Design a protein with these regions (language model features):
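Residue-level detector of beta-strand structural context in well-folded domains
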Residues: 2-3, 30, 130, 138, ...
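A generic structural motif
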Residues: 31-33, 133, 164
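Short acidic/polar mixed-charge low-complexity motifs
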Residues: 37-39, 138, 167-170
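Acidic/histidine-enriched ion/cofactor-binding microenvironments in catalytic or ligand-binding pockets
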Residues: 137, 182-183
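Zn2+-dependent peptidoglycan hydrolase active-site motif and core
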Residues: 142-180
Length: 183
């Protein structure tokens, strides 16, 4: 993996994604080379046990939203937005919960990396996001400062918004009741 580095004043940053499927090691070593200089960094890693979740939705919904065609269309449709590496930083401070009705992690319905089983079909997959449970009339807020790079409909995720926060960091908001922003 070759990360993209972003200069911000006298600092240089790179976001390095680490998949939940990577084999566990107590550390990951990075070798960074720039203009003839080599630096080695070691990142300590904490082992995580991902929980399992049985998800009860109908076969009709699964065939409409979770079939191979919908998944492939989502991946293909979103690829250009996630490939873009905005060189400007739009974020600062800490991430916020995406709704004022969310007060703590008890509002998380499904966490990142959870082993999910669709009980109607037995299909298993890893969950690639974080699902928050909010009321249908609750406003959804951007978790970080940024610019909207996609606002529209996707078969798998319904009404969807993608926000670019800069430096390759993006958030995706899916299954929305309505959209009141534009690109």
């Amino acid at each position: 993996y070759n990360p993209v580095f972003f200069r911000d004043g006298s600092n240089v940053y790179a976001l390095v994604p680490i998949s939940y499927s990577v084999e566990y090691s107590s550390s990951i070593k990075f070798t960074i080379e720039c203009q003839g200089n080599t630096t080695e960094l070691e990142l300590a890693v904490t082992n995580k046990t991902y929980r399992a979740q049985n998800y009860n939705i109908s076969v009709e919904l699964i065939s409409q939203y979770r079939d191979g065609n919908a998944t492939a269309a989502f991946a293909e449709g979103m690829a250009p937005y996630f490939a873009n590496k905005e060189t400007q930083r739009y974020f600062s401070g800490n991430l916020i919960y995406p709704s004022s009705s969310l007060k703590n992690l008890n509002s998380v319905k499904t966490g990142y990396g959870v082993y999910r089983t669709l009980t109607a079909t037995g299909t298993q997959y890893r969950h690639d996001g974080v699902d928050f449970m909010v009321g249908s009339s609750d406003s959804v807020l951007a978790a970080y400062g940024g610019k909207v790079i996609f606002a529209g409909q996707q078969t798998m995720s319904g009404r969807t918004i993608v926000i670019d926060h800069g430096y390759g960091l993006k958030t995706l908001y899916a299954h929305l009741n309505s959209i009141s922003v534009s690109e």
